[in-house]
Amino acid sequence: MAVVALVPAAGRGVRLGEKLPKAFVELGGCTMLARAVDGLRKSGAIDRVVVIVPPELVESVVADLGRASDVDVVGGGAERTDSVRAGLSAAGDADFVLVHDAARALTPPALIARVVDALRAGSSAVIPVLPVTDTIKSVDVLGAVTGTPLRSELRAVQTPQGFSTDVLRSAYDAGDVAATDDAALVERLGVSVQTIPGDALAFKITTPLDLVLARALLISETELSADSQDGK
C-alpha cells in the first residue's frame, strides 16, 4: 500500500520574524523544508514526498532539495487548503497520505513511521499528540475567562497527520475547509481520528524562541555525535 507525504510550504513566517518564507529559513546548514523532507525519507515508511510551494518558487525549491526520484515539487495556491488540494491531486492513487508541517523540521523519523504503522493497522485517520502541561482557559472577545477545560482531556496535536487518501479527499470535497488542521476536516465527516504518542522534538518552529531552541538542539546533537566518535 503506497504512502505519499504532502508538505505544504508556503507559510510566510510572520511570527518567526524572518524575511524569508519560514520553510526556507536556515536551520543547521540547510533549510527547514530540506530537514523536514529528509526526516520523511529517513523514516523508511514513505514512498514519495510531494512538496507544495508558491508556483514562482518551484524551480528554486527543486534546486534546494536536489532532484530525487521520490520527491516532487508542485505549485500550490494562496491558502494552505489550496496547497493541500494540489498535493492530493499529485498523490495519484496512493492508499495513504501524510500531511506534514515543514516547520516541524526536527520531527524524528521514528514518529513518522509510527503514524504509517497505525494507518496500515486499520485506522483511517491518525494524529500524534502530547499531553497538555499548562492550564488552558477559554476567553471571550474582551479577554474575560469563560471556562477552564479539563486538562486531562486535552492534547497538543503535531504532524505528520495520516489519513486514508479517500477520507482526506472526501473531507476536502465536503466544502467547508476552514479549520486549523486536516484532522478537524475529517472529524466533520464523522470519521474516528486515532491518536498516538507524539514526540517533543516534533515541535513547530513558529517564533524566534522556537528557532533559537531548534538551532541549540542541533548544535547539542552535533557535539554529542562528535564526542561519541572521539570515544571510539
From Swiss-Prot:
Which parts of the chain span the membrane according to its record? none
Q: Which reaction does it catalyse?
A: 2-C-methyl-D-erythritol 4-phosphate + CTP + H(+) = 4-CDP-2-C-methyl-D-erythritol + diphosphate
Entry keywords, A to Z: Isoprene biosynthesis, Nucleotidyltransferase, Transferase
Main EC class of this protein? transferase
Site feature Positions MEP for the nucleophilic attack, where: 151, 204
Q: Which Gene3D superfamilies match?
A: Spore Coat Polysaccharide Biosynthesis Protein SpsA, Chain A (3.90.550.10)
Q: List, alphabetically, the Pfam families matched.
A: IspD
Biological process, per Gene Ontology: isopentenyl diphosphate biosynthetic process, methylerythritol 4-phosphate pathway
Superkingdom is Bacteria
- What are the boundaries of the signal sequence? none
Q: Name one GO molecular function term.
A: 2-C-methyl-D-erythritol 4-phosphate cytidylyltransferase activity
Q: In which pathway does it act?
A: Isoprenoid biosynthesis; isopentenyl diphosphate biosynthesis via DXP pathway; isopentenyl diphosphate from 1-deoxy-D-xylulose 5-phosphate: step 2/6
InterPro entries with a match to the protein in the record:
IspD, IspD/TarI, IspD/TarI_cytidylyltransf_bact, ISPD_synthase_CS, Nucleotide-diphossugar_trans
* Site features described as Transition state stabilizer, chain residue numbers: 15, 22
Q: What is its EC number?
A: 2.7.7.60
Against NCBIfam families, the record matches this protein to: ispD (TIGR00453)
Q: What does this protein do?
A: Catalyzes the formation of 4-diphosphocytidyl-2-C-methyl-D-erythritol from CTP and 2-C-methyl-D-erythritol 4-phosphate (MEP).
Q: Which PANTHER family match?
A: 2-C-METHYL-D-ERYTHRITOL 4-PHOSPHATE CYTIDYLYLTRANSFERASE, CHLOROPLASTIC
The family line of this record is:
Belongs to the IspD/TarI cytidylyltransferase family. IspD subfamily.
Q: What is this protein called?
A: 2-C-methyl-D-erythritol 4-phosphate cytidylyltransferase
Source organism (scientific name):
Rhodococcus erythropolis (strain PR4 / NBRC 100887)
- Which lineage? Bacteria, Bacillati, Actinomycetota, Actinomycetes, Mycobacteriales
